[in-house]
Amino acid sequence: MKILVLGGSGMLGHKLVQQLSGDFDVWTTIRGEVERLANFGIFERERTIEQVDVEDSDTLTRVIESVAPNVIFNAIGVVKQVPTAKNAAATIALNSLLPHQLAYLAERVGARLITISTDCVFDGTRGMTTEADHPNATDLYGKSKHLGEVVEGNALTLRTSIIGRELGTRHSLVEWFLSNRGKTVKGFTNAIYSGFPTFIFAEIVADLIKNHAELRGLYHVSSDAINKYDLLLLLRKYYGVEIEVERFDEFKIDRSLDSTKFREVTKFKPRSWEEMIAIMASDPTPYDSFSR
C-alpha cells in the first residue's frame, strides 16, 4: 500500500515517515531540500519530493497524481506557537482550505484522506468534549482548524493533540522544556491535556491504515487526561534534565477530549503517560545533532 505524507519534515510528519516505512511504501513532501535533513536518516531520497509549496495548486495536483497513493496523510498546518499564526490569510489557507482541496484531489485518484484537527476547536472552559459538542474556539487558530475538518467522502478527520521532538525548530512543548536546562519553569496543575507523543500517535495511524480502512468522518482520539505539571515532571524524569518545575495553580484550562466513540469502534486502549513518555525519551533519532 502506498502512503503519501504531506509535510514530512514537521513534528508529526517525520514521525509518520519513520513509523510507517516499515509496513508501507511511504512517500513524502517537504518544503526544503532533503540534503538538509540527511543526518537524521529518516528520508529516502527517491521517495522524498522536495521544495513542494502546497499552496501552489498545480504543484500539489501533479504530486498527488504522480505518486497515486492509496492514502494521503495531511501533516501540514499552521500551529499557534509560530508567528505565521497571526497571519489570517496564511492560517486559513493551510488550516481551513487545504484539507478540503486535498479531499477533492484524493477523490480524483481514489485515495483515502486522513487529516488532523485539534482539541483547540474548543475554548477549554469544559473538558471531556465529544464529537457532538459544538466547537466554540474564540481564536483564529481554533476557528481555522474547525473550518478545515472534512467529514464527507473518503476523508477521516482526527481531533487530537500531539507533543514531540522537532527537526531543527523549537516551537512546541517538548523542545521548549528541554531548552530550559538549569532553569525554572511553571507547571500548570489546572491545564488538562489528553494528547499523545508523536511516536505513539504514529502507531495509532498505522493501525488505522492497516486495520480500519473503512473508518470515515470525525473522531476524537485521546489519551487518559493529565495535567501539564505532572506531564513536565515525567519529561524531566525520562529525559534526565535538571529543570525546576514550579507548581502554578492559577491558570485553568481543560481541553481534554472524550474518545469513547473512537475506542468503541477501534478497540483502542491508550498507554499510560509514564509508558508513553518513557518510549518517547528512548527514541534514538539524533535530534540534538541538528544545527539549529
Q: Where in the sequence are the language-model features?
A:
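Catalytic helix-loop patch of NAD(P)-dependent Rossmann-fold dehydrogenases
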Residues: 93, 97-101, 120-158, 162-167
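SDR active-site strand-loop-helix element
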Residues: 6, 29, 75-76, 113-119, ...
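N-terminal Rossmann-fold cofactor-binding loop
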Residues: 28-39, 53-54
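Mid/C-terminal beta-alpha module of Rossmann-like enzyme folds, strongest
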Residues: 202-207, 211-259, 288, 292
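NAD(P)-dependent short-chain dehydrogenase/reductase
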Residues: 138, 150-193, 199-200, 207
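N-terminal Rossmann NAD(P)H-binding glycine-rich loop of SDR-like oxidoreductase domains
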Residues: 1-23
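Amphipathic terminal alpha-helices
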Residues: 273-292
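NAD(P)H-binding glycine-rich loop region in Rossmannoid oxidoreductase-like domains
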Residues: 48-94
